[in-house]
Amino acid sequence: AIGGGIWAYNPRAQAIKAVKVGINQAIARAVGITYAETGPSHDLYQRCCAHNMFPSHNRQAFEDFWTGEVAGHSFRLFEAHLQMETKDSKGRTSRTTKFRGPLLEIGFSRKFHGTTLVTRDGAHRRFFIGGRKDSIKVASKTLDIAEMVNPEFEDAFDVYSDDQVEARYLVHPDYCEQLIAMERAFAGKKVKALFCEGKLTVILEAKQLFESGGMDAGRDREKLEMTL
């Protein structure tokens, strides 16, 4: 019975997968971009790891790659699933999800040369005494807390940078609302943004996305169009 169940499940899973890919490709064509189930992820993933944007993990998988150009800016969007795999004293393996959500990379129009990291308020806390850290070390760089002009932004986000002037130039007043709007669009949380190497990288935790095989293609398109 178990074998029969597996045999019956595989064609169903393959059919759902085929429907998902077909619908997502149609969504991509409709908005003038491309979609593929797999794609290049290593450089963006490593950039996020180097800047401590992910929780600790030892397994990673990526899917649902959207690429193209919007308003003259290249972009890449895909979903990451990061897990921690452990074994107990009896050798039994278990996996715990540490992060699931979209990774977005955009070719930025404003020229910049430093590194600026934007996180939700309190993401980097001092041990024991609490409060945000005055500086953090990531990717062999020291980023200092940046004092932003907009008090509402400071209440929601912490900004760390190795160029204070550039940080205030890049993170303009309405940026806070844009990040919060992205969180809402994906029903996500803990959004982070990184200005580095001439590109903007945004990640946030969210449930599995773009599963059009579940026949929620309209919602998938809404998420994608909002992001673009």
Residue ranges and their predicted role:
Residues 3-27:
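Transmembrane-cytosolic junction motif
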Residues 29-31, 37-228:
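Charged, low-complexity intrinsically disordered regions
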